Design a protein with these regions (language model features):
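Class II aminoacyl-tRNA synthetase catalytic cores and aaRS-like
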Residues: 1-587
Protein backbone atom coordinates (compact mmCIF):
# COMPACT_ATOMS: atom_id res chain seq x y z
CA UNK A 1 0.00 0.00 0.00
CA UNK A 2 1.17 3.53 -0.82
CA UNK A 3 0.09 6.00 1.84
CA UNK A 4 1.06 9.13 -0.04
CA UNK A 5 2.67 10.48 -3.15
CA UNK A 6 2.48 14.08 -1.96
CA UNK A 7 2.04 16.13 1.17
CA UNK A 8 -0.79 18.63 1.29
CA UNK A 9 1.15 21.78 0.47
CA UNK A 10 3.08 20.12 -2.38
CA UNK A 11 -0.06 20.65 -4.47
CA UNK A 12 -0.77 23.83 -6.42
CA UNK A 13 -2.11 24.92 -9.81
CA UNK A 14 0.95 23.47 -11.59
CA UNK A 15 -0.32 20.02 -10.57
CA UNK A 16 -3.82 20.37 -12.04
CA UNK A 17 -4.79 17.11 -13.76
CA UNK A 18 -2.32 15.00 -11.78
CA UNK A 19 -3.43 12.00 -9.75
CA UNK A 20 -2.24 12.24 -6.16
CA UNK A 21 -2.45 10.28 -2.93
CA UNK A 22 -2.41 12.16 0.36
CA UNK A 23 -2.81 11.01 3.96
CA UNK A 24 -3.69 12.93 7.09
CA UNK A 25 -6.50 13.84 9.46
CA UNK A 26 -10.02 15.14 8.92
CA UNK A 27 -9.76 18.71 10.16
CA UNK A 28 -13.24 19.67 9.01
CA UNK A 29 -16.09 18.13 7.06
CA UNK A 30 -19.16 19.80 5.56
CA UNK A 31 -21.83 18.89 2.99
CA UNK A 32 -23.08 21.25 0.32
CA UNK A 33 -25.33 20.49 -2.63
CA UNK A 34 -25.00 16.73 -2.21
CA UNK A 35 -21.20 16.91 -2.23
CA UNK A 36 -18.90 16.34 0.76
CA UNK A 37 -16.03 18.75 1.38
CA UNK A 38 -13.24 17.53 3.65
CA UNK A 39 -10.28 19.60 4.85
CA UNK A 40 -7.44 17.09 5.13
CA UNK A 41 -4.56 18.15 7.38
CA UNK A 42 -1.04 16.79 7.51
CA UNK A 43 2.20 18.14 8.96
CA UNK A 44 2.51 20.72 6.17
CA UNK A 45 -1.00 22.17 6.20
CA UNK A 46 -4.48 21.72 4.71
CA UNK A 47 -5.89 20.66 1.37
CA UNK A 48 -9.55 20.45 0.42
CA UNK A 49 -10.95 17.11 -0.74
CA UNK A 50 -14.21 16.93 -2.72
CA UNK A 51 -16.11 13.63 -2.75
CA UNK A 52 -19.51 12.38 -3.90
CA UNK A 53 -21.01 10.31 -1.04
CA UNK A 54 -23.05 8.30 -3.55
CA UNK A 55 -19.87 7.18 -5.31
CA UNK A 56 -17.66 6.94 -2.22
CA UNK A 57 -20.03 5.89 0.53
CA UNK A 58 -17.35 5.71 3.22
CA UNK A 59 -17.26 9.52 3.20
CA UNK A 60 -20.46 9.52 5.27
CA UNK A 61 -18.56 7.76 8.06
CA UNK A 62 -15.85 10.42 8.35
CA UNK A 63 -15.67 12.32 11.63
CA UNK A 64 -13.29 14.89 13.10
CA UNK A 65 -9.68 13.66 13.36
CA UNK A 66 -10.24 10.37 11.56
CA UNK A 67 -6.93 9.41 9.98
CA UNK A 68 -7.56 8.84 6.26
CA UNK A 69 -5.91 8.25 2.90
CA UNK A 70 -7.30 9.94 -0.23
CA UNK A 71 -6.49 9.27 -3.87
CA UNK A 72 -7.84 11.65 -6.48
CA UNK A 73 -7.20 14.21 -9.20
CA UNK A 74 -5.96 17.75 -8.54
CA UNK A 75 -8.39 20.34 -9.95
CA UNK A 76 -8.62 24.12 -9.86
CA UNK A 77 -11.31 25.40 -7.56
CA UNK A 78 -14.40 26.85 -9.28
CA UNK A 79 -14.48 30.63 -9.72
CA UNK A 80 -15.51 32.38 -6.52
CA UNK A 81 -14.44 29.54 -4.20
CA UNK A 82 -10.70 30.25 -4.01
CA UNK A 83 -9.48 30.53 -0.39
CA UNK A 84 -6.51 32.89 -0.21
CA UNK A 85 -5.94 32.06 3.48
CA UNK A 86 -4.84 28.52 2.56
CA UNK A 87 -1.56 27.70 0.83
CA UNK A 88 -3.54 25.23 -1.27
CA UNK A 89 -6.55 27.52 -1.59
CA UNK A 90 -6.54 27.57 -5.41
CA UNK A 91 -6.90 23.81 -5.85
CA UNK A 92 -8.82 20.83 -4.49
CA UNK A 93 -8.62 17.06 -4.83
CA UNK A 94 -11.54 15.31 -6.50
CA UNK A 95 -11.48 11.98 -4.69
CA UNK A 96 -11.62 8.61 -6.44
CA UNK A 97 -10.90 6.63 -3.28
CA UNK A 98 -11.07 7.32 0.46
CA UNK A 99 -9.66 4.86 3.01
CA UNK A 100 -10.10 5.16 6.78
CA UNK A 101 -6.71 4.32 8.26
CA UNK A 102 -7.79 4.87 11.85
CA UNK A 103 -11.01 6.24 13.38
CA UNK A 104 -11.03 8.69 16.29
CA UNK A 105 -12.98 8.88 19.50
CA UNK A 106 -14.98 12.10 20.08
CA UNK A 107 -12.49 14.85 20.88
CA UNK A 108 -12.03 16.26 24.41
CA UNK A 109 -11.56 19.71 22.83
CA UNK A 110 -11.61 21.33 19.41
CA UNK A 111 -8.24 21.32 17.67
CA UNK A 112 -8.64 24.95 16.71
CA UNK A 113 -6.30 27.81 17.58
CA UNK A 114 -9.35 29.96 18.28
CA UNK A 115 -10.46 27.69 21.13
CA UNK A 116 -9.48 28.58 24.70
CA UNK A 117 -8.57 25.33 26.44
CA UNK A 118 -7.50 24.80 30.03
CA UNK A 119 -3.79 24.01 30.03
CA UNK A 120 -4.13 20.90 32.19
CA UNK A 121 -6.58 19.44 29.65
CA UNK A 122 -4.18 20.31 26.83
CA UNK A 123 -1.37 18.49 28.64
CA UNK A 124 -3.60 15.51 29.47
CA UNK A 125 -4.17 15.05 25.72
CA UNK A 126 -0.89 16.52 24.53
CA UNK A 127 -0.78 14.24 21.49
CA UNK A 128 -3.97 15.96 20.29
CA UNK A 129 -2.79 19.42 21.31
CA UNK A 130 0.28 18.96 19.11
CA UNK A 131 -2.01 18.71 16.07
CA UNK A 132 -3.21 22.28 16.60
CA UNK A 133 -1.67 24.61 13.99
CA UNK A 134 0.16 26.92 16.38
CA UNK A 135 1.66 24.02 18.34
CA UNK A 136 2.75 22.33 15.12
CA UNK A 137 4.32 25.62 14.03
CA UNK A 138 6.16 25.91 17.35
CA UNK A 139 7.71 22.45 17.00
CA UNK A 140 8.71 23.14 13.41
CA UNK A 141 10.27 26.46 14.43
CA UNK A 142 12.17 24.79 17.25
CA UNK A 143 13.59 22.21 14.85
CA UNK A 144 14.66 24.96 12.45
CA UNK A 145 16.20 26.84 15.37
CA UNK A 146 18.43 23.95 16.44
CA UNK A 147 19.33 23.33 12.81
CA UNK A 148 20.46 26.95 12.38
CA UNK A 149 22.52 26.74 15.58
CA UNK A 150 24.27 23.56 14.45
CA UNK A 151 25.02 24.96 10.99
CA UNK A 152 26.48 28.16 12.43
CA UNK A 153 28.74 26.42 14.94
CA UNK A 154 29.84 23.87 12.36
CA UNK A 155 30.90 26.73 10.08
CA UNK A 156 32.84 28.24 13.00
CA UNK A 157 34.80 25.03 13.50
CA UNK A 158 33.09 23.67 16.61
CA UNK A 159 33.02 20.00 17.52
CA UNK A 160 29.72 18.57 18.80
CA UNK A 161 30.43 16.31 21.78
CA UNK A 162 28.03 14.52 24.13
CA UNK A 163 28.81 14.55 27.85
CA UNK A 164 27.51 12.12 30.51
CA UNK A 165 24.02 12.41 32.00
CA UNK A 166 24.75 10.17 34.99
CA UNK A 167 27.31 12.12 36.99
CA UNK A 168 28.54 12.84 40.50
CA UNK A 169 26.42 15.32 42.45
CA UNK A 170 28.05 18.77 42.38
CA UNK A 171 25.23 21.22 43.25
CA UNK A 172 25.35 24.36 41.10
CA UNK A 173 22.67 26.50 42.75
CA UNK A 174 19.57 24.33 42.50
CA UNK A 175 18.85 20.91 43.97
CA UNK A 176 20.20 17.96 42.02
CA UNK A 177 17.92 15.31 40.53
CA UNK A 178 19.29 12.10 42.06
CA UNK A 179 19.38 8.60 40.56
CA UNK A 180 20.01 5.69 42.96
CA UNK A 181 22.62 3.10 42.01
CA UNK A 182 21.47 -0.54 42.11
CA UNK A 183 24.99 -1.94 42.00
CA UNK A 184 26.37 0.41 44.66
CA UNK A 185 23.45 0.70 47.05
CA UNK A 186 23.42 3.84 49.14
CA UNK A 187 25.21 5.77 46.40
CA UNK A 188 23.59 8.06 43.88
CA UNK A 189 24.21 9.55 40.50
CA UNK A 190 22.93 13.03 39.70
CA UNK A 191 21.41 14.21 36.46
CA UNK A 192 23.42 17.21 35.21
CA UNK A 193 22.20 20.74 35.90
CA UNK A 194 24.58 21.63 33.08
CA UNK A 195 27.64 20.01 31.44
CA UNK A 196 29.79 22.64 33.20
CA UNK A 197 32.70 20.62 34.51
CA UNK A 198 32.76 18.15 31.63
CA UNK A 199 33.01 20.90 29.03
CA UNK A 200 35.91 22.35 31.00
CA UNK A 201 37.50 18.89 31.00
CA UNK A 202 37.11 18.84 27.22
CA UNK A 203 39.16 22.05 27.07
CA UNK A 204 41.83 20.37 29.20
CA UNK A 205 41.58 17.43 26.79
CA UNK A 206 42.47 19.63 23.82
CA UNK A 207 38.99 20.03 22.31
CA UNK A 208 39.40 23.74 21.65
CA UNK A 209 35.86 24.45 20.40
CA UNK A 210 33.01 22.39 21.81
CA UNK A 211 29.24 22.59 21.66
CA UNK A 212 26.32 20.42 22.63
CA UNK A 213 22.55 20.74 22.59
CA UNK A 214 22.23 19.27 26.04
CA UNK A 215 19.41 18.00 28.22
CA UNK A 216 19.71 19.43 31.73
CA UNK A 217 17.83 18.88 34.99
CA UNK A 218 17.19 21.12 37.99
CA UNK A 219 14.93 20.35 40.92
CA UNK A 220 13.76 23.93 41.38
CA UNK A 221 10.55 25.85 41.85
CA UNK A 222 8.54 26.51 38.71
CA UNK A 223 7.86 29.76 36.88
CA UNK A 224 6.52 30.33 33.39
CA UNK A 225 10.06 29.95 32.00
CA UNK A 226 11.21 27.01 34.16
CA UNK A 227 10.96 23.22 33.85
CA UNK A 228 12.51 20.33 35.77
CA UNK A 229 14.13 19.20 32.52
CA UNK A 230 15.17 21.56 29.78
CA UNK A 231 17.39 21.89 26.73
CA UNK A 232 20.28 24.29 26.40
CA UNK A 233 22.97 25.14 23.90
CA UNK A 234 26.27 24.65 25.66
CA UNK A 235 29.53 25.88 24.16
CA UNK A 236 33.11 26.40 25.27
CA UNK A 237 36.34 27.61 23.70
CA UNK A 238 40.01 27.51 24.65
CA UNK A 239 42.29 30.55 24.51
CA UNK A 240 39.21 32.77 24.55
CA UNK A 241 38.68 36.17 26.11
CA UNK A 242 35.26 37.47 27.07
CA UNK A 243 35.11 39.29 23.74
CA UNK A 244 35.63 36.03 21.85
CA UNK A 245 32.69 34.45 23.66
CA UNK A 246 30.32 37.38 23.10
CA UNK A 247 31.11 37.63 19.39
CA UNK A 248 30.57 33.88 18.92
CA UNK A 249 27.27 33.82 20.80
CA UNK A 250 26.06 36.88 18.87
CA UNK A 251 26.71 35.01 15.62
CA UNK A 252 24.56 32.12 16.86
CA UNK A 253 21.72 34.36 18.06
CA UNK A 254 21.74 36.36 14.84
CA UNK A 255 21.45 33.12 12.86
CA UNK A 256 18.53 32.09 15.08
CA UNK A 257 16.72 35.40 14.54
CA UNK A 258 17.29 35.16 10.80
CA UNK A 259 15.91 31.61 10.68
CA UNK A 260 12.81 32.12 12.83
CA UNK A 261 11.93 35.79 12.36
CA UNK A 262 13.61 36.49 9.00
CA UNK A 263 15.34 39.45 10.67
CA UNK A 264 18.94 40.47 10.03
CA UNK A 265 20.56 41.77 13.22
CA UNK A 266 23.70 43.39 11.87
CA UNK A 267 24.83 45.64 14.72
CA UNK A 268 26.66 44.42 17.83
CA UNK A 269 24.30 43.89 20.77
CA UNK A 270 24.17 46.76 23.29
CA UNK A 271 26.11 46.17 26.50
CA UNK A 272 25.44 47.23 30.07
CA UNK A 273 27.35 46.40 33.19
CA UNK A 274 25.33 44.77 35.95
CA UNK A 275 25.59 48.00 37.96
CA UNK A 276 24.30 50.09 35.04
CA UNK A 277 21.41 47.69 34.43
CA UNK A 278 20.34 47.77 38.07
CA UNK A 279 20.73 51.56 38.36
CA UNK A 280 18.84 52.38 35.16
CA UNK A 281 16.27 49.59 34.94
CA UNK A 282 16.14 47.94 38.36
CA UNK A 283 16.83 44.54 36.82
CA UNK A 284 19.79 42.43 35.75
CA UNK A 285 17.74 41.33 32.73
CA UNK A 286 16.21 44.62 31.56
CA UNK A 287 13.67 44.95 28.79
CA UNK A 288 15.14 47.83 26.77
CA UNK A 289 12.26 48.03 24.28
CA UNK A 290 10.89 50.98 26.26
CA UNK A 291 12.38 53.74 28.40
CA UNK A 292 10.91 54.60 31.81
CA UNK A 293 14.40 54.57 33.30
CA UNK A 294 15.11 55.01 37.00
CA UNK A 295 16.40 58.46 37.97
CA UNK A 296 18.57 59.22 41.03
CA UNK A 297 17.05 61.97 43.22
CA UNK A 298 19.41 61.93 46.21
CA UNK A 299 20.91 65.38 45.63
CA UNK A 300 17.47 66.92 45.07
CA UNK A 301 16.39 65.96 48.58
CA UNK A 302 19.66 66.26 50.52
CA UNK A 303 18.17 69.10 52.63
CA UNK A 304 14.56 67.91 52.58
CA UNK A 305 12.25 68.25 55.56
CA UNK A 306 10.17 65.27 54.43
CA UNK A 307 11.02 62.64 57.04
CA UNK A 308 10.66 59.58 54.81
CA UNK A 309 13.24 60.92 52.36
CA UNK A 310 15.65 62.36 54.93
CA UNK A 311 15.47 59.15 56.97
CA UNK A 312 16.39 57.04 53.96
CA UNK A 313 19.41 59.22 53.14
CA UNK A 314 20.57 59.38 56.77
CA UNK A 315 20.44 55.59 56.89
CA UNK A 316 22.73 55.26 53.87
CA UNK A 317 19.87 54.61 51.47
CA UNK A 318 18.83 56.28 48.25
CA UNK A 319 15.85 58.09 46.70
CA UNK A 320 14.95 57.25 43.12
CA UNK A 321 11.96 57.61 40.84
CA UNK A 322 10.41 56.75 37.50
CA UNK A 323 8.00 58.61 35.24
CA UNK A 324 5.36 56.08 34.16
CA UNK A 325 3.71 58.51 31.74
CA UNK A 326 0.31 60.11 31.48
CA UNK A 327 -2.50 57.95 32.80
CA UNK A 328 -5.64 58.09 34.88
CA UNK A 329 -4.90 57.57 38.55
CA UNK A 330 -7.80 57.16 40.95
CA UNK A 331 -7.15 56.85 44.66
CA UNK A 332 -7.91 53.13 44.43
CA UNK A 333 -5.40 52.75 41.59
CA UNK A 334 -2.80 54.69 43.59
CA UNK A 335 -3.40 52.43 46.59
CA UNK A 336 -2.95 49.45 44.28
CA UNK A 337 0.47 50.75 43.23
CA UNK A 338 1.47 51.15 46.88
CA UNK A 339 0.33 47.60 47.63
CA UNK A 340 2.30 46.30 44.66
CA UNK A 341 5.42 48.15 45.83
CA UNK A 342 5.06 46.48 49.22
CA UNK A 343 4.81 43.08 47.52
CA UNK A 344 8.12 43.90 45.83
CA UNK A 345 9.76 44.66 49.19
CA UNK A 346 9.12 48.36 49.83
CA UNK A 347 7.84 49.82 53.09
CA UNK A 348 5.81 52.27 51.02
CA UNK A 349 5.71 54.26 47.79
CA UNK A 350 5.34 57.95 46.99
CA UNK A 351 3.07 58.66 44.03
CA UNK A 352 2.71 62.07 42.42
CA UNK A 353 0.64 63.20 39.45
CA UNK A 354 1.18 66.43 37.54
CA UNK A 355 -2.24 68.14 37.43
CA UNK A 356 -3.61 70.14 34.49
CA UNK A 357 -2.57 73.40 36.18
CA UNK A 358 0.97 72.13 36.70
CA UNK A 359 0.63 71.55 40.43
CA UNK A 360 1.47 68.22 42.03
CA UNK A 361 -1.35 65.97 43.22
CA UNK A 362 -0.03 63.74 46.00
CA UNK A 363 -0.52 63.06 49.71
CA UNK A 364 3.10 64.17 50.23
CA UNK A 365 3.05 67.32 48.06
CA UNK A 366 2.54 69.54 51.12
CA UNK A 367 5.81 68.24 52.61
CA UNK A 368 7.89 69.18 49.56
CA UNK A 369 9.35 72.63 48.98
CA UNK A 370 8.72 74.56 45.77
CA UNK A 371 12.30 73.85 44.66
CA UNK A 372 11.85 70.13 45.33
CA UNK A 373 8.58 70.06 43.40
CA UNK A 374 9.99 71.90 40.38
CA UNK A 375 13.14 69.80 40.58
CA UNK A 376 11.08 66.61 40.42
CA UNK A 377 9.25 67.81 37.32
CA UNK A 378 12.53 68.75 35.66
CA UNK A 379 14.55 65.70 36.72
CA UNK A 380 11.83 63.21 35.71
CA UNK A 381 10.93 65.19 32.56
CA UNK A 382 7.30 65.25 33.64
CA UNK A 383 4.45 66.68 31.57
CA UNK A 384 0.80 67.32 32.43
CA UNK A 385 -0.94 64.12 33.50
CA UNK A 386 2.28 62.18 34.10
CA UNK A 387 2.51 59.90 37.14
CA UNK A 388 5.76 59.82 39.10
CA UNK A 389 6.63 56.94 41.43
CA UNK A 390 9.35 57.44 44.06
CA UNK A 391 10.94 54.93 46.43
CA UNK A 392 13.30 55.66 49.31
CA UNK A 393 15.15 52.78 50.96
CA UNK A 394 18.31 50.71 50.60
CA UNK A 395 19.67 50.65 47.04
CA UNK A 396 18.82 46.99 46.50
CA UNK A 397 15.22 47.44 47.66
CA UNK A 398 14.67 50.62 45.65
CA UNK A 399 16.06 48.97 42.52
CA UNK A 400 13.88 45.87 42.74
CA UNK A 401 10.74 47.88 43.60
CA UNK A 402 11.05 50.44 40.81
CA UNK A 403 12.28 47.77 38.41
CA UNK A 404 9.21 45.66 39.14
CA UNK A 405 6.81 48.60 38.77
CA UNK A 406 8.51 49.55 35.51
CA UNK A 407 7.80 46.11 34.07
CA UNK A 408 4.22 46.19 35.39
CA UNK A 409 3.44 49.57 33.83
CA UNK A 410 5.73 49.84 30.80
CA UNK A 411 4.81 48.62 27.35
CA UNK A 412 7.07 48.23 24.30
CA UNK A 413 6.01 50.11 21.18
CA UNK A 414 5.84 46.84 19.27
CA UNK A 415 5.79 43.19 20.27
CA UNK A 416 7.79 42.26 17.16
CA UNK A 417 11.02 43.97 18.21
CA UNK A 418 13.97 41.79 19.20
CA UNK A 419 15.97 43.73 21.78
CA UNK A 420 19.07 41.66 22.54
CA UNK A 421 21.40 42.91 25.26
CA UNK A 422 24.57 41.84 27.05
CA UNK A 423 24.85 42.36 30.81
CA UNK A 424 28.45 42.05 32.02
CA UNK A 425 30.48 42.62 35.17
CA UNK A 426 28.33 40.73 37.65
CA UNK A 427 29.35 40.63 41.30
CA UNK A 428 31.51 37.61 42.01
CA UNK A 429 29.45 36.68 45.08
CA UNK A 430 26.00 37.24 46.56
CA UNK A 431 24.72 37.25 50.12
CA UNK A 432 22.14 34.65 51.09
CA UNK A 433 19.20 35.47 53.38
CA UNK A 434 21.06 33.84 56.27
CA UNK A 435 24.10 36.05 55.69
CA UNK A 436 26.29 33.39 54.12
CA UNK A 437 28.12 34.05 50.87
CA UNK A 438 27.29 32.23 47.64
CA UNK A 439 28.37 32.55 44.01
CA UNK A 440 26.47 34.74 41.56
CA UNK A 441 26.86 32.39 38.58
CA UNK A 442 28.84 29.31 39.62
CA UNK A 443 32.05 28.70 41.57
CA UNK A 444 34.16 28.10 38.47
CA UNK A 445 33.84 31.70 37.21
CA UNK A 446 37.04 33.71 37.06
CA UNK A 447 37.24 37.02 38.95
CA UNK A 448 38.40 40.19 37.20
CA UNK A 449 40.90 40.73 40.03
CA UNK A 450 42.16 37.85 42.14
CA UNK A 451 43.62 40.26 44.71
CA UNK A 452 40.28 42.03 45.19
CA UNK A 453 38.46 38.73 45.47
CA UNK A 454 40.72 37.75 48.37
CA UNK A 455 40.93 41.14 50.12
CA UNK A 456 37.35 42.36 49.60
CA UNK A 457 35.20 39.56 48.16
CA UNK A 458 31.93 41.47 48.50
CA UNK A 459 33.22 44.06 46.01
CA UNK A 460 34.81 41.56 43.62
CA UNK A 461 33.60 41.57 40.02
CA UNK A 462 33.41 38.39 37.96
CA UNK A 463 34.17 37.77 34.30
CA UNK A 464 30.56 36.67 33.83
CA UNK A 465 27.96 37.82 31.34
CA UNK A 466 24.29 37.21 30.54
CA UNK A 467 22.43 37.41 27.23
CA UNK A 468 19.00 39.05 27.54
CA UNK A 469 16.21 39.24 24.98
CA UNK A 470 13.13 41.41 25.59
CA UNK A 471 13.59 41.18 29.34
CA UNK A 472 14.12 37.40 29.34
CA UNK A 473 17.45 36.00 30.48
CA UNK A 474 18.40 33.60 27.69
CA UNK A 475 21.52 32.30 29.34
CA UNK A 476 24.84 33.09 30.90
CA UNK A 477 28.52 32.39 30.63
CA UNK A 478 31.91 33.33 31.96
CA UNK A 479 35.63 33.07 31.62
CA UNK A 480 36.57 30.06 33.73
CA UNK A 481 39.24 29.61 36.36
CA UNK A 482 42.14 27.66 34.85
CA UNK A 483 44.53 27.91 37.81
CA UNK A 484 43.89 25.29 40.54
CA UNK A 485 45.26 27.63 43.22
CA UNK A 486 42.71 30.31 42.29
CA UNK A 487 39.95 27.69 42.24
CA UNK A 488 40.87 26.69 45.79
CA UNK A 489 40.82 30.36 46.82
CA UNK A 490 37.29 30.72 45.47
CA UNK A 491 36.18 27.67 47.44
CA UNK A 492 37.77 29.19 50.55
CA UNK A 493 35.94 32.50 50.10
CA UNK A 494 32.70 30.53 49.73
CA UNK A 495 33.35 28.81 53.05
CA UNK A 496 34.12 25.43 51.46
CA UNK A 497 36.93 23.94 53.51
CA UNK A 498 39.79 22.03 51.91
CA UNK A 499 38.47 18.63 52.97
CA UNK A 500 35.02 19.31 51.48
CA UNK A 501 36.53 20.73 48.31
CA UNK A 502 38.65 17.61 47.85
CA UNK A 503 35.73 15.29 48.52
CA UNK A 504 33.38 17.05 46.09
CA UNK A 505 35.76 18.39 43.45
CA UNK A 506 39.10 16.67 43.97
CA UNK A 507 38.93 14.92 40.59
CA UNK A 508 38.38 18.28 38.87
CA UNK A 509 41.05 20.11 40.86
CA UNK A 510 43.53 17.40 39.84
CA UNK A 511 42.59 17.86 36.17
CA UNK A 512 43.38 21.58 36.45
CA UNK A 513 46.97 20.62 37.35
CA UNK A 514 47.70 19.35 33.82
CA UNK A 515 48.30 22.42 31.68
CA UNK A 516 44.76 23.79 31.57
CA UNK A 517 44.35 26.42 28.83
CA UNK A 518 42.54 29.71 29.51
CA UNK A 519 38.96 29.11 28.43
CA UNK A 520 35.43 30.42 28.61
CA UNK A 521 31.98 29.62 27.40
CA UNK A 522 28.30 30.17 27.44
CA UNK A 523 24.98 28.35 27.65
CA UNK A 524 21.47 29.48 26.78
CA UNK A 525 18.09 27.85 26.97
CA UNK A 526 16.75 26.59 23.66
CA UNK A 527 13.29 26.52 25.23
CA UNK A 528 13.44 30.17 26.31
CA UNK A 529 14.83 31.38 23.00
CA UNK A 530 12.15 29.50 21.07
CA UNK A 531 9.50 30.89 23.42
CA UNK A 532 10.48 34.52 22.79
CA UNK A 533 11.07 34.14 19.05
CA UNK A 534 7.67 32.45 18.67
CA UNK A 535 5.92 35.08 20.80
CA UNK A 536 4.75 32.61 23.44
CA UNK A 537 4.26 33.42 27.14
CA UNK A 538 5.39 30.05 28.48
CA UNK A 539 8.10 27.59 27.53
CA UNK A 540 5.49 24.85 27.92
CA UNK A 541 4.17 25.90 24.52
CA UNK A 542 7.49 25.16 22.79
CA UNK A 543 8.22 21.86 24.58
CA UNK A 544 6.51 18.74 23.18
CA UNK A 545 5.73 17.09 26.52
CA UNK A 546 6.26 19.53 29.40
CA UNK A 547 5.41 19.24 33.09
CA UNK A 548 2.90 21.46 34.85
CA UNK A 549 4.02 24.16 37.27
CA UNK A 550 3.84 21.53 40.03
CA UNK A 551 6.13 19.14 38.15
CA UNK A 552 3.40 16.72 37.07
CA UNK A 553 2.76 15.16 33.67
CA UNK A 554 -1.07 14.91 33.50
CA UNK A 555 -0.86 12.49 30.57
CA UNK A 556 1.39 9.78 32.05
CA UNK A 557 0.73 10.82 35.67
CA UNK A 558 4.44 11.08 36.39
CA UNK A 559 5.87 11.17 39.00
CA UNK A 560 4.35 7.91 40.22
CA UNK A 561 4.93 5.16 42.75
CA UNK A 562 7.19 2.27 41.81
CA UNK A 563 7.01 -1.38 42.79
CA UNK A 564 8.31 -2.37 46.21
CA UNK A 565 10.58 -4.87 44.42
CA UNK A 566 12.33 -2.05 42.57
CA UNK A 567 12.88 -0.14 45.80
CA UNK A 568 14.36 -3.20 47.50
CA UNK A 569 16.77 -3.74 44.61
CA UNK A 570 17.96 -0.17 45.13
CA UNK A 571 18.18 -0.47 48.90
CA UNK A 572 15.56 2.25 49.37
CA UNK A 573 12.73 2.36 51.90
CA UNK A 574 10.07 5.09 51.93
CA UNK A 575 9.76 6.67 55.38
CA UNK A 576 6.50 5.99 57.24
CA UNK A 577 5.70 9.70 57.63
CA UNK A 578 6.00 10.18 53.86
CA UNK A 579 3.58 7.31 53.24
CA UNK A 580 1.17 8.73 55.83
CA UNK A 581 1.30 12.20 54.31
CA UNK A 582 0.69 10.76 50.86
CA UNK A 583 -2.31 8.76 52.07
CA UNK A 584 -3.71 11.82 53.85
CA UNK A 585 -3.43 13.78 50.61
CA UNK A 586 -5.34 11.02 48.83
CA UNK A 587 -2.46 10.07 46.56
Amino acid sequence: MTYRTDQATDLDTTRVGDTTTVSGWVSRRRDHGGVAFVDLRDATGLVQVVADPEEIQIVDELRMEYCIKVTGVVQERPEGTVNHEMLTGEIEIHANEVVILSPSKPLPFMLDDRSEIEERIRLRYRYLDLRRPHMAANLQARSRLTGAIRRTLDELGFLEVETPTLIRSTPEGARDMLVPSRLRQGNFYALPQSPQLFKQLLMIGGVERYFQIARCYRDEDFRSDRQLEFTQLDLEGSFWTQEDVLVTVEAVLKAAAREIRDVDLTDPFPRLTWQEAMDRFGSDKPDIRFGMEIVVLDDLFEDTEFGVFSGALDGGGTIRGINVGSRELSRAQADGLVDRAKELGAKGLVWIQVSEDGSLRSPVAKFLSDDEQSGLISRLEASLGDVLLIAADRWKTVSQVLGGLRLDLGRPNTQDELAFLWVTGFPMFEEEDDGTRTFSHHPFTSPVSIDEMVSDPDRAISQAYDAVLNGVELGSGSIRIHDPAVQRQVFEVLGIDEETAERRFGWFLEALEYGTPPHGGFAFGIDRLAMVLQGEDSIRDVIPFPKTQTGVDPMTEAPAEVDETQLKELGIQIRAEVIAAREEAGE
